[in-house]
Swiss-Prot record:
Annotated family: Belongs to the universal ribosomal protein uL6 family.
Name of the gene encoding the protein in the UniProt record: rplF
PROSITE patterns cross-referenced by the UniProt entry: RIBOSOMAL_L6_1 (PS00525)
Statement: the UniProt record of this protein carries the keyword Ribosomal protein: yes
Pfam families for the chain: Ribosomal_L6 (PF00347)
The protein's name in its UniProt record: Large ribosomal subunit protein uL6
InterPro entries cross-referenced by the UniProt entry: Ribosomal_uL6-like, Ribosomal_uL6-like_a/b-dom_sf, Ribosomal_uL6_a/b-dom, Ribosomal_uL6_bac-type, Ribosomal_uL6_CS
Function: This protein binds to the 23S rRNA, and is important in its secondary structure. It is located near the subunit interface in the base of the L7/L12 stalk, and near the tRNA binding site of the peptidyltransferase center.
Subunit note: Part of the 50S ribosomal subunit.
HAMAP family noted in UniProt: Ribosomal_uL6_B
């Protein structure tokens, strides 16, 4: 049984957390994030510590989710989030210009993807893509969308994968 919702969140001095109705805004050195939270969960802030409490046991799941979301928001405005992708395959390459990522991954046409607001896309080499931002959800979602353009296949391992991803390989069919 998870008790994540009961853990307190320590707020760094460089971060301010304000509540306005159901919206919680987190401001930090890297930027500002706002999110609407469920009104069934109570929010208490004192002496740089935030606690969430629920009124009944039926709200356990949303209790832990809200606590994790706020902890991720605080982490994002302090340190930010980063995802790295690798393109593996002959002729596969990526170019980032003006926050538009152009992928050449074996299709008859290049695939262009515009980065969402608050996300920066850079390419350190033709096969390495780095996505950075302050929202864990937006960075992860955009990285997943890029990976879905050409996900790694199990026979040769070609495709777009996360830098730390291990692709399970399959053996090809045997001849007669």
């Amino acid at each position: 049984m998870s008790r994540i919702g009961l853990k307190v969140i320590n707020v760094p001095e460089s971060v301010t957390v304000t509540k306005n109705g159901n919206e919680i805004t987190v401001k930090g050195p890297k930027g500002e994030l706002t999110r609407e939270f469920d009104p069934r969960i109570k929010f208490e802030q004192e002496d740089g510590v935030i606690r969430f409490s629920r009124s009944n046991e039926n709200d356990k799941a949303i209790h832990g989710t809200m606590r994790a979301n706020l902890a991720n928001m605080i982490e994002g405005v302090v340190n930010g989030y980063k995802k790295e992708l690798k393109l593996i395959g002959v002729g596969y390459r990526a170019v980032a210009k003006n926050n538009v990522l152009t992928l050449n991954v074996g299709y008859s046409h290049p695939v262009e993807m515009k980065a969402p607001e608050g996300v920066t896309v850079t390419t350190s080499s033709a096969t390495d893509v780095t996505i950075e931002g302050i929202s864990k959800q937006v960075v992860g979602q955009f990285a997943a969308e890029i990976r879905a353009v050409r996900s790694p296949e199990p026979y040769k391992g070609k495709g777009i994968r996360y830098a730390d991803e291990v692709v399970r390989r399959k053996e090809g069919k045997t001849g007669k």
